[in-house]
């Protein structure tokens, strides 16, 4: 099973955010922990972290027929990026949208997000656990 992981703007600064709390969680460490948590499953992950809307849309469109699901950490895109929402709805990909709890929150929570829909389920929590929970949703179906 192929899962796309789309990571939105400023998520590359996760290490900076965690350092303020005297922790050491970087984006690379988050990705490695996700891979470790699901390694016994028959899942292949394809990651993209970007600040650029067009790259995110290209990633979704080009991989739409190869992936069973999308794990999406929208960060600031959660409030305003209707183009990505439209793309998710058009390609009808099952989507887990991830929101980090405080202190890892990037400013937008599920209540302020535009990412809701028939194929979209939201998960809120600490970075690793919420991402793993979002991926496990695809195993249930």
Where are these regions (language model features)?
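Short glycine-rich anion-binding loops that position phosphate/pyrophosphate groups of nucleotides
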Residues: 9-11, 75-78, 101-103
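Short acidic/histidine-rich motifs immediately flanking catalytic phosphotransfer sites
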Residues: 63-70
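Short acidic active-site motifs
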Residues: 55-59, 80
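Extreme N-terminal starter segment of soluble prokaryotic enzymes
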Residues: 1-4
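Short, acidic/small-residue loops that bind anionic groups at enzyme active sites
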Residues: 88-108
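Short beta->alpha junction loops
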Residues: 44-54
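Short, glycine-/small-residue-rich phosphate/pyrophosphate-handling segment
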Residues: 47, 104-141
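Glycine- and acidic-residue-enriched helix-capping/strand-helix junction motifs
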Residues: 13-29
């Amino acid at each position: 099973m192929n899962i796309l992981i789309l990571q939105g703007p400023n998520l590359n600064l996760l290490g900076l955010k965690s350092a303020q709390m005297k922790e050491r969680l970087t984006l690379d460490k988050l990705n490695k922990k996700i891979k470790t948590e699901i390694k016994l499953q028959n899942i292949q992950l394809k990651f993209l972290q970007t600040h650029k809307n067009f790259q995110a849309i290209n990633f979704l469109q080009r991989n739409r027929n190869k992936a069973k699901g999308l794990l999406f950490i929208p960060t600031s895109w959660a409030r305003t990026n209707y183009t990505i929402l439209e793309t998710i709805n058009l390609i009808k990909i099952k989507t887990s949208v991830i929101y980090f709890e405080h202190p890892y929150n990037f400013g937008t929570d599920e209540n302020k997000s535009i990412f809701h829909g028939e194929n979209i389920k939201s998960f809120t929590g600490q970075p690793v656990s919420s991402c793993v929970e979002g991926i496990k949703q695809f195993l249930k179906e």
